[in-house]
């Protein structure tokens, strides 16, 4: 199997690191060689958080270069656009449509770009966009955006049984919120 490259991007505090941990756990248990690498930047101050998850028969490096990502899983819309150059031509963006204003926008020095999904699609990018925040809140907590996105991502890996996704979820989230996260995952699957 060729190496599959997944970038998980978001803003600090959104749960992207838990999502990458769950994904890595899932893929190791599915029998793949897996490499995970995290880049935090100014994540504690609302800055970008990027995680690379690579899996296949044999993976030699945890880093994804520009033009190599099969998937960009984005917790925030501008982050999807910011990292788009890492997507390969046949790749896909799976993104939350939530918009979190970066500091230059908050300070009035810039405007949040409009119509980002349409702009990416106009460039030929395959974009699977949904309001993950609304679905997470429907499941019971805004903090479950990560599991909504993981549920949506599972749609693109039909060879990995849903039971394996759920087992990885249970192994990586606190017991008191497992049921809520299962609901969020299921809502993400439905899209």
Language-model features and meaning:
Residues 1-191:
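Active-site cofactor/cluster-binding pocket
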């Amino acid at each position: 199997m060729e190496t599959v490259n997944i970038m998980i991007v978001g803003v600090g505090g959104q749960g992207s690191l838990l999502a990458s941990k769950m994904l890595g756990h899932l893929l190791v248990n599915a029998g793949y060689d897996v490499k995970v690498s995290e880049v935090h930047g100014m994540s504690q101050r609302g800055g970008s958080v990027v995680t690379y998850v690579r899996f296949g028969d044999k993976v030699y490096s945890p880093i994804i270069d520009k033009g190599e990502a099969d998937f960009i899983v984005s917790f925030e819309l501008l982050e999807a656009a910011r990292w788009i150059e890492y997507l390969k031509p046949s790749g896909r963006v799976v993104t939350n449509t939530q918009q979190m204003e970066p500091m230059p926008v908050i300070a009035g020095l810039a405007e949040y770009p409009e119509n980002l999904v349409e702009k990416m699609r106009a460039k030929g990018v395959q974009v699977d966009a949904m309001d993950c925040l609304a679905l997470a809140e429907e499941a019971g907590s805004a903090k479950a955006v990560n599991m909504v996105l993981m549920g949506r991502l599972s749609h693109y890996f039909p060879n990995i049984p849903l039971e394996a996704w759920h087992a990885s979820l249970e192994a990586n989230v606190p017991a008191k919120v497992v049921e809520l996260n299962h609901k969020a995952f299921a809502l993400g699957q439905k899209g």
